[in-house]
From Swiss-Prot:
Localization (cell): Cytoplasm
Main location: cytoplasm
Keyword Glycosyltransferase attached: no
Organism (species): Bordetella avium (strain 197N)
Domain Carrier, residue spans: 2-77
GO annotation, biological process: lipid A biosynthetic process
Record's keyword annotation contains Lipid biosynthesis: yes
Protein name: Acyl carrier protein
Length: 79
């Protein structure tokens, strides 16, 4: 079974059209991976679907790196 980290990276790769190998935990969605605000909304929705959780807007705004997404899912998502 894939880890949360692997699943998050796979979703990021699919949503942002980047190679999964290029995605580092410290990668910034906006600065390093080329996401824009619409990409971020779609990414949050994909994470919510995958991990059966709801990410409030005020929390979603704080998720700017891959590691922050992983940490949030570890704390709030269904494994």
């Amino acid at each position: 079974m894939e880890s949360i980290e692997q699943r998050v990276k796979k979703i990021v790769a699919e949503q942002l059209g980047v190679n999964e190998a290029e995605i580092k935990n410290e990668s910034s969605f906006l600065d390093d991976l080329g996401a824009d605000s619409l990409d971020m909304v779609e990414l949050v929705m994909a994470l919510e679907d995958e991990f059966e959780t709801e990410i409030p807007d005020e929390e979603a705004e704080k998720i700017t790196t891959v590691q922050q997404a992983i940490d949030y899912i570890n704390s709030h998502g269904k494994q």
